[in-house]
């Protein structure tokens, strides 16, 4: 069969920002290393670079980055750092091999008592339950913690599972502040035509 190589890019950074080198047989679960002449940094909310292994917004500078949105200077300024990097809105980490891995979308991040919680991590944990087909979570207002995690669960056919079961499983596998406070069981998750979970519809 043909060898498939992963890459990462956006419309604003066409065609690609990072890639995995061809010829490597192992699956890295990363988006690889930066393209030539491309600089990628991970930054916190104050614009400072984060340490290796820490999550930060993926910012890009290179020949493939757009000049700006057509006749939309304010929108362009909103996604451009003071030193000229494009802010992708994706949260990533950098591993010891120099490879980047996407963690989540920054807009989907949940802030619980000042701690950053990434929905993908919680969803991946809950998906390991035998009784769960799939799951998705969002942040909801909470008087004590500003935001709390609300988890939507689609059960496996004929599975018997309740909210207490899910919360107990999360407590065994997640840090305390990441454990969902609310559980909702639904028949199916809203998705785009390509199968992407639409968290915005869950918020509505």
For each predicted feature, which ranges?
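Active-site glycine-centered loops adjacent to acidic/histidine catalytic or metal-binding residues
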Residues: 9, 32, 47, 90, ...
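AMP-binding/adenylate-forming catalytic core of the ANL superfamily
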Residues: 62, 67-68, 75, 91-178, ...
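Conserved ATP/PPi-binding loop(s) of AMP-dependent carboxylate-activating enzymes
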Residues: 33-37, 48-79, 117
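Beta-strand->loop->alpha-helix junctions that form or flank phosphate-binding loops
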Residues: 5-12, 32-34, 138-141, 184
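Short loop/turn microsegments at loop-to-beta-strand junctions
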Residues: 31, 37-38, 88-89, 133, ...
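Hydrophobic alpha-helical segments, especially N-terminal targeting/anchoring helices
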Residues: 43-44, 52, 80, 88, ...
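Gly/Ser/Thr-rich phosphate-binding loop
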Residues: 1-26, 39, 46
């Amino acid at each position: 069969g043909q060898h498939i190589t992963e890459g990462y890019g956006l419309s604003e950074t066409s065609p690609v920002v990072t890639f995995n080198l061809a010829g490597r047989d192992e699956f890295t679960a990363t988006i690889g290393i930066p393209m030539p002449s491309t600089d990628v940094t991970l930054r916190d909310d104050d614009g400072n670079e984060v340490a290796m292994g820490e999550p930060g917004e993926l910012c890009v500078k290179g020949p493939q980055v757009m000049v700006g949105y057509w006749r939309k200077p304010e929108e362009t300024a909103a996604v451009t750092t003071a030193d000229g990097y494009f802010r992708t809105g994706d949260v990533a980490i950098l591993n010891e091999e120099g490879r980047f891995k996407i963690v989540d979308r920054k807009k989907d991040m949940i802030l619980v008592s000042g701690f950053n919680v990434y929905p993908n991590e919680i969803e991946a944990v809950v998906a390991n339950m035998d009784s769960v087909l799939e799951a998705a979570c969002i942040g909801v207002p909470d008087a004590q913690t500003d935001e709390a995690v609300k988890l939507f669960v689609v059960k496996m056919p004929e599975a018997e599972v309740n909210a207490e079961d899910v919360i107990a499983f999360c407590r065994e596998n997640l840090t305390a502040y990441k454990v969902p406070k609310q559980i909702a069981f639904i028949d199916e998750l809203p998705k785009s035509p390509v199968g992407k979970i639409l968290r915005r519809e869950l918020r509505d």
